[in-house]
Amino acid sequence: LAMAEAGNSRPASGAEHHISHYLEMWFVAQKKRVPLHGIKVGLGTLVSAYLYEALERDGVAFRGAEETYRAAKMIPPPDELARTLQRLGAPVRFSALGISRELFREAVSRAHTVRPRFTVLSLLDELGLMQRYLPELEERFY
């Protein structure tokens, strides 16, 4: 309904989809079997949910932070999302896709360039914080 109202996929396509699309393009370029879209989006959702929590935890200030943090409270915590994915038999680590650590870091760092939409990954890039959070993301989700 939100996409129909907006007239585009923006309401349902954030950083999680950008990560998925980045990886999709890599798998296609390597002529490898592309993991299911939902699997990649599920993993990207873990990253996004974690980043919103981490930014608020660290008190990162930016224009619109208060509204962003308030809206992000509607997203289930990443641990809860991970348990749900596990119950469904889905992976909760990007390494399950057979990708390297380097590709994981590249995908998370560059996925914001896939489409001209502002996401939590765009925010990290704009604030110069990507390298600060990349080790945490790698530890938790690779």
Predicted feature residues:
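C-terminal charged capping/lid subdomain of soluble metabolic enzymes
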Residues: 54-142
